[in-house]
Amino acid sequence: MSIRTEKVASLLQQELGMILEKEFPRGGPILTVVEVKVTADLGIAKVYVSVIGSAKEQADTIEYLQQEKKNIRKILSSKIRHHFRRIPELEFYQDRLYEKADRIEQLLKEVRKEQE
């Protein structure tokens, strides 16, 4: 990634985090914007979110974000329009890094128990 795309991704991550917290409060699972990856032409922003909750809550939250992405983009545009000529299209994905890390930790604990 170039320096520009990194700066854009960082700005989008901060703003989207605030938007999701303030403009779209939902009771239920905790939602965190973990990472944003922007294409070189700044046309698409892939937003990776971490959802802490049951599997159904996670799926419902991602589905909700996909349905609301036009509204989220509109709010984002009103907040950062002076930075961009065109606001990137948003694509939401669930970040599964924490689940993978938890699984690795469980496996390591099992190995340690077997060695004792």
UniProtKB/Swiss-Prot annotation:
<dbReference type="InterPro" id="IPR015946">
    <property type="entry name" value="KH_dom-like_a/b"/>
</dbReference>
<dbReference type="Pfam" id="PF02033">
    <property type="entry name" value="RBFA"/>
</dbReference>
<dbReference type="InterPro" id="IPR000238">
    <property type="entry name" value="RbfA"/>
</dbReference>
<comment type="subunit">
    <text>Monomer. Binds 30S ribosomal subunits, but not 50S ribosomal subunits or 70S ribosomes.</text>
</comment>
<dbReference type="InterPro" id="IPR023799">
    <property type="entry name" value="RbfA_dom_sf"/>
</dbReference>
<dbReference type="GO" id="GO:0030490">
    <property type="term" value="P:maturation of SSU-rRNA"/>
</dbReference>
<protein>
    <recommendedName>
        <fullName>Ribosome-binding factor A</fullName>
    </recommendedName>
</protein>
<comment type="similarity">
    <text>Belongs to the RbfA family.</text>
</comment>
<comment type="function">
    <text>One of several proteins that assist in the late maturation steps of the functional core of the 30S ribosomal subunit. Associates with free 30S ribosomal subunits (but not with 30S subunits that are part of 70S ribosomes or polysomes). Required for efficient processing of 16S rRNA. May interact with the 5'-terminal helix region of 16S rRNA.</text>
</comment>
<keyword id="KW-0690">Ribosome biogenesis</keyword>
<dbReference type="GO" id="GO:0005829">
    <property type="term" value="C:cytosol"/>
</dbReference>
<dbReference type="GO" id="GO:0043024">
    <property type="term" value="F:ribosomal small subunit binding"/>
</dbReference>
<keyword id="KW-0963">Cytoplasm</keyword>
